[in-house]
């Protein structure tokens, strides 16, 4: 089976925060799982280097947009690598290959009659003497009356036209823009109304889109899909490939989502592989992002794919809700955020991955609390999982000289483990990652109970053969926890693999156990709870 996984592209205008990771982490869990299953996986993403936020940041700092994009693209790559993300291709939207692919898609849509020219009114700043891209216009949402940008309202998820905003202001200088006529290209989104409606009806039956994606897309369909501009007067971006319009750029809402396609083509070019199987209707596709990106993946991207004749419209939409920080809405402008480069300097990446999975905002907003983060590490990763692994391997090291005793696998344990592979696998495929991880940790707690009830420290004296059986079965459980937890906790899984010399990474019950173990080191270190107060003080102290 061909599995395509697309992770949303973060804007390269500032550091990643935990809200980004909470929405993107499911993509890596899926990729690791399906590779272990032996499926053909293509997992792609990249940095959005063409967006208006980058141009604004560059203007504020007095540097070029490329300077900003380079800085954060490199930081993103480093953060994703240090968090264990296993992208097959992580690229950027200001690359030549991306520009070429996007222009080709634009021309195909134009040739098929899905793009047309239209004279429209657009916000123009007399002070800055320029037409204003949508994100350069800020004001009040006409639907919910909250503060909004010219392209979208984060409060109610409405896709907006800048001229719809109330109390419009230029983001650059704060003046009220005028309205002038200009010519732009438009995407005939309304012509895909019935196909998008059918797609939503289908996923309501299969349950392969998150509820928030279904509800929001149904709302758009009910209101009637509106044609959208595909060109803008932007300072950076992909030039319109039509003579006489080269000074205009392809609008980022269609250009950025086409990044999945351009990354796929770039991967194929680099590896010599054929990527077409990932764009056929039989492909199993997952798009992983936050709920603010839903309409771009549930309406616009499917319409673009249909418009160019590709069959792989999004089968799974993994659109997480929002992550708050210490019960407050995350705000980058106010510096109310936990920044990824910062937390990675001091904490185990598996601790971050664990907390953002068991506490994932899958169906509702959830909160990142330093207290909960540190206590979950100490109680679950260290106290449950680390404790079981350490007490078993230390027992072998102390009483068997590092040689794993001989034994036979308990039938009940074998059935439990094989059932766990099936249950966890199904949960991952259904994008129920929290359920999957909690199921494994239920088994970890069962394993600790098994160790306690068998009391190998007593068996060793009273019944050495039973002791060997107990320890052998504990090693069997550890070897399988390593595989089951690989998609979630890859770093600790790798450490145990090295200790036990486990080579097999397949998603199946491990029956061949190691004969000996190498030097045993603690799997996790205890975090001093005094860190809670320190981290909270640091967070409040950084607020602007």
From Swiss-Prot:
One of its GO terms (molecular function) is methionine-tRNA ligase activity. Gene3D superfamilies: HUPs, Isoleucyl-tRNA Synthetase, Domain 1, Methionyl-tRNA synthetase, Zn-domain. One of its GO terms (cellular component) is cytosol. The keyword Ligase applies. It holds the Pfam family Anticodon_1. Keywords: Aminoacyl-tRNA synthetase, ATP-binding, Cytoplasm, Ligase, Metal-binding, Nucleotide-binding, Protein biosynthesis, Zinc. Its EC number is 6.1.1.10. A motif ('KMSKS' region) lies at residues 329-333. It is found in: Cytoplasm. SUPFAM superfamilies: Anticodon-binding domain of a subclass of class I aminoacyl-tRNA synthetases, Methionyl-tRNA synthetase (MetRS), Zn-domain, Nucleotidylyl transferase. Binds 1 zinc ion per subunit. A motif ('HIGH' region) lies at residues 10-20. It catalyses: tRNA(Met) + L-methionine + ATP = L-methionyl-tRNA(Met) + AMP + diphosphate. ATP binds at residue 332. GO terms for biological process: methionyl-tRNA aminoacylation. The keyword GTP-binding does not apply. Its cofactor is Zn(2+). Zn(2+) binds at residues 141, 144, 153, 156. HAMAP family: Met_tRNA_synth_type1. Belongs to the class-I aminoacyl-tRNA synthetase family. MetG type 1 subfamily. Monomer. Is required not only for elongation of protein synthesis but also for the initiation of all mRNA translation through initiator tRNA(fMet) aminoacylation. This is Methionine--tRNA ligase. It comes from Bacillus cereus (strain Q1). The gene is metG.
